Amino acid sequence: MNKSMLIFFTILFLTYIIEEKEALKVEDLPEPESYKRAKQLAVKDAKGDKNAETIALNFLKQNRRDCMKNCKLVPTCALLSPECCPDKTDVCKKLAL
């Protein structure tokens, strides 16, 4: 591989890293009250079982992230991600989805 190709791919890779680092992610947003209530219910339903609690919280987190892209994924998308469902707000449009 010649030097120009190496330089090109290095710059491309660095641009990708910077873009990913600076992009607004779902985890960067404050949690809405409806999502906090859903997390509390998940912990309550686990009845002290830490494994079940972890699975439920991970499930909610993944659904919140996926609902940002597709509001018809589950019926509770409007509760999990009110920034994007049913209407996309400016915050939702800035997310790196």
Curated annotation (Swiss-Prot):
Domain of life: Eukaryota
UniProt keyword annotations, A-Z: Disulfide bond, Secreted, Signal, Toxin
UniProt GO molecular function: toxin activity
Record PTM text: Contains 3 disulfide bonds.
Tissue: Expressed by the venom gland.
Main location: secreted
Secretion signal, residue range per the UniProt entry: 1-23
Compartments, as annotated in UniProt: Secreted
Disulfide bond entries: none
Transmembrane segments: none
Gene Ontology CC annotations of this record: extracellular region
Entry's family note: Belongs to the scoloptoxin-10 family.
Protein's name in the database: U-scoloptoxin(10)-Ssd2a
